[in-house]
Amino acid sequence: MTQDELKALVAQAAADYVLANVPEGAVLGVGTGSTANLFIDAMAPHKARFAGAVSSSEASTRRLQGHGFAVLDLNEVDTIPVYVDGADEIDDTGAMIKGGGGALTREKIVASVAGRFVCIADGSKLVDVLGAFPLPVEVVPMARAAVARQLAALGGQPRLRMTKEGQIYQTDNGNVILDVSGLRIGEPKTLEAQINDIPGVVTVGLFAKRGADVLLLGTEAGVQRRDF
């Protein structure tokens, strides 16, 4: 199967998981990215069963609304039973690198209030040690040089994210992203705390303190489920 076929497989598995485990009238938490988009598409026929969804990005909001979902403000929602999102990398403890799509801060916020985080990914995303995928760090624009120096002191090689048009990439929150390569992340929780403590950092794309609870992994043999 192609990578796109594996993504579609896990997206449908996530839809099946939600339908089996989330009560009618609940609010869904929805992530960002290509696999999350396929999950949104798979849930579209069942939208009437749910009160609505909380989205982690403007892009996902547009896709949800295009399918007729009510997209709710997180401030108006008391509980989110399940948050479904992809990952750029995930290890065997459920710790993840996320943020390749630029929505790491909102993803982390929605994940933090969800009862359960269901990660959907193809088999290429499962790794022994995090860090081959450059680690995204969202930064207040005025602090980007100062933060970059501190990330370099931690052993990383930070690079300012740019658009295809050669402009500085801007998040939905109006910030910039430093993508940090060269890190071999043996202790994700420790590094997450270290980077979050740097003044000017909004958040880091390490999801270790609040990692995945369930992984639905698309493989040639089908969807594998892992619980953490």
From Swiss-Prot:
Q: From what superkingdom does this record's organism come? A: Bacteria
Give the enzyme class: isomerase
Enzyme Commission number, as recorded:
5.3.1.6
Q: Which InterPro entries match?
A: NagB/RpiA_transferase-like, Ribose5P_isomerase_typA_subgr, Ribose5P_isomerase_type_A
Instruction: Work out whether the entry's keyword set contains Zinc-finger.
Output: no
Alphabetically list the UniProt keywords: Isomerase
Q: Summarize where substrate binds, as residue positions.
A: T32, G33, S34, T35, D85, G86, A87, D88, K98, G99, G100, G101, K125
GO MF annotations in UniProt:
ribose-5-phosphate isomerase activity
Pathway of action: Carbohydrate degradation; pentose phosphate pathway; D-ribose 5-phosphate from D-ribulose 5-phosphate (non-oxidative stage): step 1/1
> Does the record's keyword annotation contain Chaperone?
no
Residue positions of the active site: E107
Quaternary structure and partners? Homodimer.
- HAMAP family named in the record: Rib_5P_isom_A
The record's comment on protein family reads:
Belongs to the ribose 5-phosphate isomerase family.
Listed name of the protein: Ribose-5-phosphate isomerase A
Report the gene name.
Answer: rpiA
